[in-house]
Amino acid sequence: MIKNYPEIIPIFPLGGVIYFPKTNLPLNIFEQRYLDLVNDIYNKDKLMGMIQPQKNNNSFFKVGCLGKITDFQKSKDGRIMINLTGITRFEILNEVKNNKLYKEFKVDYKKFNKDFSSSSYNEEMSSFMIKAKNFFKKNGLLLNWKEFDNLDNGQKINTLAMIAPITNEEKQKLLEAITLKFLGLPKVC
């Protein structure tokens, strides 16, 4: 089920940060263009996209994550601290020209309609979790698995993808995967 999310969204490109649905991302905003972006959306629908810039050029990966501001605090020195809660992934269709300091893009959410259903992962989840636990143990990573079990399947998958000790390019591939079958994390476990 895709809700009526905007087809034109402002984009916050941030290298080294891959952001997933059903996860939270704290951000410290200090550049004027992104202060403008956050102020504009906070007074509107609170929705913005996070996208990974590609290396060595001014383009972006085609898949990012739509998030909603769920916490907003201004500091005395003009910075804004926000928490962004991931909603769904999107695919960039094209840039929309504007007179703003930040970029806006026309996006499509259809490919990622399973972001709204944790039950779509049920069949493969048991095998995936065994492989994920082995992967984390093998890499010396500690995780409170009892607490982790309280998350829904979508949150589990996306949280593991965010915190896994893999490259940003590998995380981007995980973000672009449409279903658990295409995730790739079990292949590296």
Where are these regions (language model features)?
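N-terminal low-complexity, acidic/polar interaction/targeting segments
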Residues: 1-189
